[in-house]
Amino acid sequence: MSKVALITGVTGQDGSYLAEFLLEKGYEVHGIKRRASSFNTERVDHIYQDPHTCNPKFHLHYGDLSDTSNLTRILREVQPDEVYNLGAMSHVAVSFESPEYTADVDAMGTLRLLEAIRFLGLEKKTRFYQASTSELYGLVQEIPQKETTPFYPRSPYAVAKLYAYWITVNYRESYGMYACNGILFNHESPRRGETFVTRKITRAIANIAQGLESCLYLGNMDSLRDWGHAKDYVKMQWMMLQQEQPEDFVIATGVQYSVRQFVEMAAAQLGIKLRFEGTGVEEKGIVVSVTGHDAPGVKPGDVIIAVDPRYFRPAEVETLLGDPTKAHEKLGWKPEITLREMVSEMVANDLEAAKKHSLLKSHGYDVAIALES
């Protein structure tokens, strides 16, 4: 009989990759999606199955991590073997604008799920995975960061996720639940939301190359991050629930790059070589040379990268670097996709969209490129 999995945040980057992964393993997959005024299922449309078909394996449920009765009803109906809590208000900058909502969804939402599992008597049947975050380390106490590194969160998002981390540990220890945290370092893909810095970079570089934008504005380009591919990370999430005993794991590559280096890699994919001049808010990224045919919209001397202080965080997280040794040694997990391969994939995806917009523009159509304010 097929295992049954329930994924919160199924329409997001990780949720969609995880749903694909589990379906390939023969699972019956149920996902929770929020009601929206427009369709927000584009990341899972390709695996959607008409409920009228015979024995569908993928199901969507309307729900919200702020609604206890809704979550309890879904858990009662689905009776999952595994729950993956990937749903969250996950944008660090936005969490400063909406701290109460962030706490309600990210912290209390995790508690609601754990308590619903316990209330329904599923604590011995259902295994629970909590998507934690490297943002817990914040003002880092040691480099690299591992499972035993002290936490020092620096945003409402990270503080909410800290509660979620510890309540997961508490329910594991108090009620004998199979509940564990995956401390995820930054992970990206072509499905990454467009307001996150990596996707903002690859999308803007593609648009600039096609003459649809003139300049990409960023915040702290000195920030150092450990970036992996979401496909690799969802595999590790599944592996964590297949052990005999629940444990918490860091999920990371163990390799670190700056935001500036990410920009340089993305530009290089389109034959654009950059040099950076100035410091702080005066720093600029200037085109040195252009090769190939993918960047007709830029020329040497163009300033295509600049700093906007609006994108600085109230409390910066300067450096994050994970130590995935425990994952390697205990589960045999290691990332398979390199950063350069991931950047290439993301840029190619965004370039395809930019070329379509450029073609429409060349035929006289107005093309509105949605940009982050």
Swiss-Prot record:
Catalytic activity: GDP-alpha-D-mannose = GDP-4-dehydro-alpha-D-rhamnose + H2O
One Gene Ontology term from the biological process aspect of the record: colanic acid biosynthetic process
Annotated effect of mutating residue 161 to A: Strongly reduces activity
Chain residues that bind NADP(+): 9-14, 64-65, 86-90, 101, 161, 187, 192
Main enzyme class: lyase
Function summary: Catalyzes the conversion of GDP-D-mannose to GDP-4-dehydro-6-deoxy-D-mannose.
Species whose genome carries this gene: Escherichia coli (strain K12)
Subunit and interaction comment: Homodimer.
Name of the protein described by the UniProt record: GDP-mannose 4,6-dehydratase
UniProt superkingdom: Bacteria
Enzyme Commission numbers on file: 4.2.1.47
NCBIfam families: gmd (TIGR01472)
